[in-house]
Amino acid sequence: VGSEMCIRDRAEEYALVPDAFVGVTPKVVVKEGVHVNSGDALFVNKACPEVKFASPVSGTVTAIERGERRKVLCVKVKADAEQQATDFGKKNVDVLDGEAVKNALLEAGLFGYINQLPYAVSTTPDTKPKAIFISALRDMPLASDFEKELEGNEDAFQAGLTALSKVAKVYLGVGIDQHSRALEEAKNVEVNVFDGPCPAGNVGVQVNHIDPVNKGEVVWTVDPSAIIFFGRLFLTGKVDLRKKVAVAGSEIKTPGYAEVLVGTPLSAFVADQLKATEHVRLINGNPLTGVQTDMAGFVGGHTSEITAIPEGDDKDEMLGWILPRTSQFSTSRSYFSWLFGKKKEYDLDARVKGGERHMIMSGEYDKVLPMDIFGEYLIKAIITGDIDKQEQLGIYEVSPEDFAVAEFVDSSKLELQKIVRDGLNTLRKENA
């Protein structure tokens, strides 16, 4: 991703999207026409009402959009010309205890940005984590560089780390090529350096290598952007959800970074960056773990990049895979492109190139799943609904994103991330 900043005017309307917080069933606590400050709750977790979700801006609630079965899709707020923020009071993180930290995050509507293993869902304050994991290494294709976001936010990042260290031991994972002092010299945490290809940056992979999750145990996982949100809260007493989001992909004119708020409409900073308006796949996130979106979408609570790649629906390749192509990527060396080495770049599109089929090829997942689990057998156990087998094979340690690369190379074309998510949801209901 380029380093050029995409400077944009502030949008008129913002929206908080509940789907960005996995495992949360939202209960809206505002009505249309009501005025809110930034930091005021727009909705809460129905299962745990003390977990609030804060408005990114001050303004008037203009719409509560619902989908099928009245599912809340988003809460929209028209921003004031002069922004007002609820003041939660500055706090010295050095003297706070764990309960005070949790209460501060709950009051300000930021606690929901913390996820947990098992189940890979937004956590609740009654969980007792044995450790907290943060991965500053983003190594998915077209992912943003967290060091870009860290620039100018070093103090807030450290304050957030110190605050969480009062709750449990904090492990910070960094990449071998990351040299920001705020990462290398982070205080009150254990810094672990990771070297290797994607998915080395996945927080689940790091948990598996450092302190695996057994049945009955819980660890918290936090996106590094949220650590900055937490730190700003303690340093200023106010909710500030600004972040740098990468705008990348072969369909983007000038890849770079946009400084936006959570809830910013994509149309405000992506629309004039697209090379074309047709035959383009716009993704909220990276191509492997992101969600298909369009210009009506918004920056989610955990969004770190917006990517655009060719859809591929306008391609008509004569004789398909039979021709010995040199510009097509293949993990199984089906094309001669492997002769050009690993540094050759490819312009991949969104086509699946094949239909779903039985799992015949063995060992495919293990090559790209650097965890001490049998990925293939775990997937089979989830498909067959064998909960005992799933537990034995380590389902409590995984999240859907851990299978993203495996899904990409899978010759069976299975939606592995969806399979894992469905399995985790079923297990969560069984153990509730």
Model-derived features with residue positions:
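Short histidine-centered loop motifs in beta-beta connectors
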Residues: 25-35
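Short coil-to-beta-strand transition motifs
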Residues: 50-58
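Buried, small/hydrophobic-residue-enriched core segments of structured protein domains
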Residues: 51, 65-432
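Short, structured beta-strand/loop micro-motifs enriched in basic residues and often containing a Trp
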Residues: 14-27, 44-45, 250
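Short, small-residue-biased leader/transition segments that mark boundaries at the very start
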Residues: 2-6
